Amino acid sequence: MVDQLESEIIGIIKNRVESEGGDGETALIVGDLTAATELTALGVDSLGLADIIWDVEQAYGIRIEMNTAEAWSDLQNVGDIVGAIRGLLTKGA
């Protein structure tokens, strides 16, 4: 079951991927975005991941302390991003 946080983060990722103008195949995947969706399937590279992280930081008023190389190895799918943000928000609460 998708909770509010996961739904919001999926929305942030969809907006970023759509604004980057992926191809038709990527658009189909974006329409069916779930926690299991791999970032590479969305056409997200390390720069795109940095943009997504920035978008999430702005949306939640948090700072994600990791360099792009660490993020790229740790955050492989949408669920990984949701889990990382959930952990940061829980710490801050």
From Swiss-Prot:
Modified residues (O-(pantetheine 4'-phosphoryl)serine): 46
Domain of life according to the entry: Bacteria
Modification(s) after translation: 4'-phosphopantetheine is transferred from CoA to a specific serine of apo-NodF.
PROSITE patterns in UniProt: CARRIER, PHOSPHOPANTETHEINE
Keywords: Nodulation, Phosphopantetheine, Phosphoprotein, Plasmid
Domain annotation Carrier: ranges: 4-89
Entry keyword Phosphoprotein: yes
Entry annotated with the keyword ATP-binding: no
SUPFAM superfamilies registered for this protein in UniProt: ACP-like
InterPro entries: ACP-like_sf, PP-bd_ACP, Ppantetheine_attach_site
Function: Proposed to synthesize nod factor fatty acyl chain. Involved in trans-2,trans-4,trans-6,cis-11-octadecatetraenoic acid biosynthesis.
The protein's name in its UniProt record: Nodulation protein F
Organism lineage: Bacteria, Pseudomonadati, Pseudomonadota, Alphaproteobacteria, Hyphomicrobiales
